[in-house]
Amino acid sequence: EERVLDRKNGIDRRVQYAYDAAGNVLKQAILGTDGECLESSTRYDLKDRATHRTNPAGGVTRYLYDRNDRLRKEISPYGYEPESDDGAGVSYTYDSRGNRLRTTNALGEVVQELSYNLRNQPVIQKDTFGNRTELSYELDGKIKDVRRSGNHQRTLQQYEYNARGQITGVVDGNRNPISYDVDSWGRITGIGFVDGVKEGYEYTPAGQVSRTIDGNGNAVQYRYNSLGKISERIDQLGFTETFRYDEEGNLSLHIDRDGRRLQRACNVFGQPVYEKATDAEGKHTNISTWHYDSLGRVTRAVCDGKSYEYIYDAYGNLKEKRSNGKRLVSYTHDRAGQITEIMDPAGVSTRYEYDILGRRSRIYNNDGLEVRYGYDALNRISRIHYGNGVETAYTYDGDGNIRTLETKAGENVLLS
């Protein structure tokens, strides 16, 4: 059992574990003093491989392995079928040396294919759209260059190293060289760009950045406390920004370059319980406070005279947000912990649906408003379809940038 106790702020969280004979964690229960219990569990096979993980809401993630103990399939709560103890999930295939060759998502779409050299380093990466990335290596195994092959073959990155194996230069996809100066510890002391601009860095004996110099010669200085945290930052004009910390290392005071102060007190988890902001003269005070339950979840926040309350369901998800006792918004979640319904103060409900990969596929309400989302195999939005018939379609280039965007209403093109 583990216990986190902060009597001053009402936190008393206990975590209990149950183990099998092999030392594997079977159950984890997070307990609060108000009767809260968030329990998750894990099942193992005879080879001590995790086969089922169940979250507090009962959602099951299933893992299946090949005869060489490699993960061959991972099924999310959206794809898991208890009746068959199986379902649609992400599948992996390997070569005889254990290198992952192919990743296929739960819809059967090939996400990525890999090829390796004799050193088991990936030399070719290919996605479902045929975009092919090739990598070459130095004799010591460091990446030499990265190339994109296909209709427009080009080099994406080239790397140069010194005798110690430290990067001293990079040539980007536009053939712009960037040079790096390094000290005997391998720390970057200068960066030179193709236009002649150079940036510089200096360090403390402990290896922290003590001074930076931008391309215009402007310097920013940094000072640190005994714990290695920044205590002062002196900008290019000589103005000082001050930082102070409590005994746990949490920021307790921040004074900006104009003298504005922010005082803060935190609980045992580093979460703020009190903040006081003032101007340089100590006026125009703004105080905020936060209250937490025994598990460390925020239950009340007060700022500018407004009070907000937070209520959670039995599985630890945010259920309701209130202001001065009035409900602002309420939430419903599925077994995977994703929001399925949001209800506003007027009782208007907005619902959310997800596909088998856990991607948001539909948003709708009782007034007939609806939006549907489609995705490609790389989890990028490929289309957005609105209830009024308007649809926006997206295509992407080999670097993942949007190549085309077209909005249509029926056969009429509205935007392209």
Give, region by region, the residue ranges found by the protein language model.
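Beta-strand elements of repeat-based all-beta scaffolds
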Residues: 1-172, 176-193, 197-214, 218-235, ...
